[in-house]
Amino acid sequence: LLEDECKQKKKKMSTPNFEQLLEAGCHFGHLKRKWNPAMAPYIFMERNGIHIIDLYKTAAKLEEAAAALKNIAKSGKKVLFVATKKQAKQVVADKATSINMPYVIERWPGGMLTNFPTIRKAVKKMTNIDKMTKDGTFDNLSKRERLQITRQRAKLEKTLGSIADLNRLPSALFVIDVMKEHIAVAEANRLGIPVFAMVDTNSNPNNVDFVIPANDDASKSIELILDTVCAAMAEGIEERKAEKADAPAEGEEKDAAPKRERRRVRKADAEVEAAAEESAE
């Protein structure tokens, strides 16, 4: 039994080993002349003018980040994934959708976090257009108006469709390439929202709360890291569902206990009254 439990624990929250990280090319950094000295603790060596990332540190940091993201997902909160670079877009869209998390893969809308109410208004506009289409109001408009609204809807969908369900500020950001997404990182820093990120040797890790030192340019590297964190978050979501299913049963037991207690009290009161009557006689 203990062996089975250990195996199950190993199956859960599994992070890639050194060989898997190596195979995905997570160790390739940038040219030495492009490096950011703040990344020095995560650099293993320099080879042919290119910095090589220490994959043992990558594995440790990835495990730490995955555990923290699992807890966020388990508490029912949202993590916003941000990746507007070509090689990361589709992977991020697929992985975030699979765990029902919001994401931004087109241009980052300035003020997305710091001016969140305005962004919500734009999302509401999109919802209103959908309502118009359903209730027939849209059909009563002129051809020109319909065309304008359709174009507006398509534009909003492209930039905000993936965050339509984000009703409040996210509890964390997961960023691929902090240099490219520096505006998103700055907004999160300003609001005290934790930032998880894949950080390459040319980037500044100081504005990131959970640094995952890794190659943020190769699609295989991006996919492996995302697979790991999304699998951990999926576990957190499943655990939350399981706990919610158990909660009503516990609640029923708690309700039953006071009833039993009340019965005992009534019985004791009745016995006291009977004894009092006997002594009076």
Regions found by a protein language model. Name each.
Residues 12-78, 84-85, 89-132, 143-146, ...:
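N-terminal cationic and glycine-rich segments that engage phosphates or anionic surfaces
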Residues 25, 81, 173, 225:
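Residue-level signature of catalytic and energy-coupling elements of molecular machines
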Residues 99-206:
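Long, charge-patterned amphipathic alpha-helical coiled-coil/hairpin "stalk" segments used as oligomerization
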Residues 53, 82, 175-177, 198, ...:
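Conserved beta-strand segments of the P-loop GTPase G domain that flank and frequently precede/overlap
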Residues 184-187, 191-243:
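Short glycine/threonine-rich loop/turn motifs
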Residues 58, 84-85, 178, 201, ...:
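Short beta->alpha junction loops/turns
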Residues 66, 153, 226:
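Short amphipathic alpha-helical/adjacent loop interface patches that line ligand
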Residues 1-15, 235-281:
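Intrinsically disordered, compositionally biased charged tails
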